[in-house]
């Protein structure tokens, strides 16, 4: 190496390093998990390889093989690095907010909400590049396999947690900001068959409780909280809590970051 050349430095995401370390710990203590851990994590060089494998493994059909799916998804990750960055942020969000998540590898191996979100992210990227039917295929399979139906045209930010993830519906023109948390059975839907911009806009840091429905082209202000089982039909100011059917403001959100604190009590 000449004096003018700088040594190459390999930068490895610390979360990825931790995931690999956690995986090795699992094998050392639970040898019956060896095959699962090796094929799902340790055999892979990076997170994008893991995600491509896991999504292809879950979403393949007799007409769309695992190998073909893996190749297409991995190519999307290699083309758009933002997809990998967003996946890391989603993993961290789950680890920080879900008290049942003790390790970074858990979302990758066991959490269908996380996997469904990554399937959406890949589909959204491909949809934006004209591969509409493949993005619809991913949407269909994600709905069938994970019970999560996110239209590939929806816009979803970074650091998202979808907890439990049964019966999640996010419509075509919905917008979800950064650092949002939602529990199972959340619907971000329209109010009929109107076309155009017809779905909710969810601000940064919002917490959507279990069974909450937000309907129509309305705005939920940043760092607000929608109580479980509520039906929201009108705009919600920032830093407020709404509850009821139809939902009404019942107080402040109680903290600066409801989605991070995950306190579902009504203040």
Regions found by a protein language model. Name each.
Residues 143-250, 255:
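Structural signal for interior beta-strand "rungs" in well-ordered beta-sheet cores
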Residues 1-141, 259-267:
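Terminal amphipathic alpha-helical/low-complexity segments used for targeting or macromolecular assembly
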């Amino acid at each position: 190496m000449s004096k003018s050349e700088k040594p190459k430095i390999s930068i490895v995401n610390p979360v990825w390093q931790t995931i690999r370390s956690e995986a090795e710990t699992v094998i050392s203590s639970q040898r019956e998990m060896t095959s699962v851990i090796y094929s799902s994590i340790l055999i892979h060089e990076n997170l994008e390889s893991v995600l491509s494998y896991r999504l292809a493994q879950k979403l393949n059909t007799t007409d769309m093989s695992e190998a073909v799916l893996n190749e297409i998804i991995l190519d999307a990750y290699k083309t758009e690095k933002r997809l990998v960055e967003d996946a890391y942020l989603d993993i961290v969000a789950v680890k920080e907010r879900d008290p049942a998540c003790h390790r970074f590898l858990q979302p990758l191996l066991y959490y269908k909400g996380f996997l469904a979100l990554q399937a959406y992210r890949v589909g959204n990227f491909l949809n934006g590049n004209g591969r509409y039917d493949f993005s619809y295929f991913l949407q269909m399979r994600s709905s069938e396999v994970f019970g999560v139906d996110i239209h590939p045209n929806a816009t979803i930010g970074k650091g998202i947690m979808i907890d439990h993830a049964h019966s999640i519906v996010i419509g075509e023109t919905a917008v979800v900001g950064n650092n949002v948390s939602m529990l199972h059975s959340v619907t971000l839907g329209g109010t009929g068959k109107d076309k155009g911009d017809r779905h909710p806009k969810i601000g940064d840091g919002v917490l959507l409780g279990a069974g909450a429905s937000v309907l129509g082209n309305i705005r939920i202000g940043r760092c607000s909280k929608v109580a479980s089982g509520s039906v929201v039909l009108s705009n919600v100011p920032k830093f407020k809590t709404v509850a009821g059917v139809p939902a009404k403001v019942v107080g402040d959100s109680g903290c600066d970051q409801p989605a991070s604190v995950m306190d579902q009590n009504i203040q």
